[in-house]
Amino acid sequence: MSDDHHDDEHFHTGDSGAAATFPKQCSALRKNEHVMIKGRPCKIVEMSTSKTGKHGHAKVHMVAIDIFTSKKLEDICPSTHNMDVPVVKRREYLLMAIDDGYCSLMDPESCEQKDDLKLPDTELGQQIRDAYEKDEGSVLVQVVSAIGEEAILGWKVSTKE
């Protein structure tokens, strides 16, 4: 038997090879959908279309909120142009511990541990910390990932055992 510990190696951060974005025609985008604006993944909060002018296509004006920073971004593009739409994934993790501002999380399905996410430096982070310290049930945090970024964007207490 060799001393190689191949089963100790974990490659959880590897990219599946799937694209982080996909193209979608500007005129097909809708409010509450996601879109990339200035290289950031955003949720569309407002859209308006201007009529076709004598110099070309109808224009679509979008107002969107960055899903990670909550900053408001705007873009105007011809309705026939393609825009990048980020692939946004949401997962729930069980909060096991909060250590030095980082969350120790466990996937409730696979039991895999995740220790690389910072507790948000906002009111949301304080709410999660308070719920965890009250110990009234399991705290589940919602982790959103897009374009290689991840952040905790929500939480709830699960009282079922």
UniProtKB/Swiss-Prot annotation:
Presence of keyword ATP-binding: no
Gene3D superfamilies per record: 2.30.30.30, Nucleic acid-binding proteins
Pfam families reported in the protein's UniProt record: eIF-5a, IF5A-like_N
UniProt entry keywords in alphabetical sequence: Cytoplasm, Elongation factor, Hypusine, Protein biosynthesis, RNA-binding
GO biological process: gamete generation; gonad morphogenesis; nematode larval development; nematode male tail tip morphogenesis; positive regulation of translational elongation; positive regulation of translational termination; translational elongation
Predominant localisation class: cytoplasm
Tissue: Expressed in the somatic tissues.
GO molecular function: ribosome binding; RNA binding; translation elongation factor activity
Post-translational note: Lys-54 undergoes hypusination, a unique post-translational modification that consists in the addition of a butylamino group from spermidine to lysine side chain and leads to the formation of a hypusine residue. eIF-5As are the only known proteins to undergo this modification, which is essential for their function.
InterPro entries to which the protein is assigned, alphabetical: IF5A-like, IF5A-like_N, NA-bd_OB-fold, Rib_uL2_dom2, Trans_elong_IF5A_hypusine_site, Transl_elong_IF5A_C, Translation_prot_SH3-like_sf
A GO-annotated cellular component: cytoplasm
Keyword presence, Kinase: no
Subcellular localization, as worded in the UniProt entry: Cytoplasm
Known role: Translation factor that promotes translation elongation and termination, particularly upon ribosome stalling at specific amino acid sequence contexts. Binds between the exit (E) and peptidyl (P) site of the ribosome and promotes rescue of stalled ribosome: specifically required for efficient translation of polyproline-containing peptides as well as other motifs that stall the ribosome. Acts as a ribosome quality control (RQC) cofactor by joining the RQC complex to facilitate peptidyl transfer during CAT tailing step.
PANTHER family: TRANSLATION INITIATION FACTOR 5A FAMILY MEMBER
Similarity comment text for this entry: Belongs to the eIF-5A family.
Protein name per UniProt: Eukaryotic translation initiation factor 5A-2
